[in-house]
Amino acid sequence: MTVALQGSLMVDVAGTWLTAEDRHLLRQPEVGGLIIFARNIEHPRQVRELSAAIRAVRPDLLLAVDQEGGRVQRLRQGFVRLPAMRALAAHPNAEYLAEQCGWIMATEVLAVGLDLSFAPVLDLDYQRSAVVGTRAFEGDPERAAVLAGAFIRGMNSAGMAATGKHFPGHGWAEADSHVAIPNDERSLEQIRANDLVPFARLSKQLAAVMPAHVIYPQVDAQPAGFSRRWLQDILRGELQFDGVIFSDDLSMAGAHVVGDAASRIEAALTAGCDMGLVCNDRAAAELALTAAQRMKVTPSARIARMRAQAKASTDYKQDPRWMLAVGALRDAQLIE
């Protein structure tokens, strides 16, 4: 039976409010999510209003943001400036602090009407990749898994599902996949012994995984996000992962190896992604939409698992747990 693709595209909008063109795009059944960026954000109340406007058009849309801490946090004015995750490792109570960071982040994101942040980063810090760097918890895979697991516990306790990225690990490749096509020349055995460890340890805690736009030529000629070898054989098969697979942004240079936006969304979904992100390029999003409309795939039921499990009160700063969590980070001199 032929089934029209529904809900397998995540797109974005240009401003702090919706245009008629935005509303038309969001009404397309193939669009299943929207990610917001810094350009869409002024302050918490405005983000809540934008979220409400989006849900008035499509109540079922998954609303996302990148709110990791450190240099990657889109929600800034009126929000806690969380530390880079690498800063936690030096503290004797790093695991406790990681859990508080996860809870604070998720609480603030949920309070403005969003469903999830694409976090945590499970890449290892080899001090080779500038694009990863301090976004990683650690260079040691077991320690990274412990700290990321604590961060996930905090997210989950606030009501948010976790997304581990960037599978199978972006930390060794030096090039930035936003502007280039990185290569990691290591063997599968080397990657399995190191970078895959956090993904393997946390496979049951992760609701989603986001693959890297990195080519691992000793494993497959395609970037991981377009590779059935990585997504089906290793992630689904070897690691027994049954959560959502989100592509990374298909507008990034690291994704261009497979062609135009139509080719990219087709390649990502065919390889095993449940949802493809097409951001910062409306023409590319429309091209991907056209491709999605002509594809014959079964919509993924997994995506519904990513919706917010709780709605944080706008008065969350009066919650004793908030005061305790923020106080712990201040005492550790991780936030102001």
Cite the ranges covered by each PLM segment:
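Active-site mouth loops of central-metabolism enzymes
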Residues: 7-18, 85-100, 180-193, 251-259
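Short, acidic/polar
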Residues: 13-27, 97-108, 193-199, 259-267
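Second-shell residues forming the walls of enzyme active-site clefts
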Residues: 39-57, 73, 149-316
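Glycine-rich anion/phosphate-binding loops
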Residues: 42-49, 90-107, 139-147, 189-192
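A short C-terminal boundary segment appended to hydrolase-like catalytic domains
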Residues: 300, 308-336
